[in-house]
């Protein structure tokens, strides 16, 4: 019995649909949640946008919400710093070198390399599937929010699950990667069933940077950047409120006036 069979037997009692339980484990849920949160942040949905507007005498005072998209610039700088120049391969055997250069060009691996480093910087992890299409070696970088690598308690990489739900049809799909083959599952027609099985040349390649919390996974650059930018956005927003409300457009308040409701914490002035 190999380690994967032992893992499935020990954790899931040899259930052929073991992958359904694997993807809802707490460690996976937390990691996917972080990926989605980082994706939302890079899309412009920042914490500062949650600042509440304040009310005064039946009128709404719209508080300032300053968004700084500097995180994108930082990540792009790191991507360009590492892959700003074309990758150059070297080998003592000229024939081997030419072969690998042809593979690199035909498979458009310059783009693949950039996608990998970009997702590692954004999400901490990236996953590459290598396959052959009409005799050409190619690679596909998987969506980090749909990727579930399977490790055992010793940190050995055993399997990989790609899972997503189509937003238009609400059909859920699972691509379960084993070392030598891939099972394609779907719940189209209400019940989960095996659609097809294809050959594979190995598990998806898992790229990640180093993390002191978990050696099997990486950590996003945004983990360190977001708290700083959130604080900066909050300060600049409140500073803008203080300038426009206190200096340019002050609100008159009578001393001793009865306040019938609490003042929002985000109100400045």
Spans of features found by a protein language model:
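Intrinsic disorder/low-complexity segments enriched in polar/small residues
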Residues: 10, 21-23, 31, 184, ...
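Charged, low-complexity, helix/coiled-coil-prone segments
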Residues: 42-47, 55-65, 172, 234-252
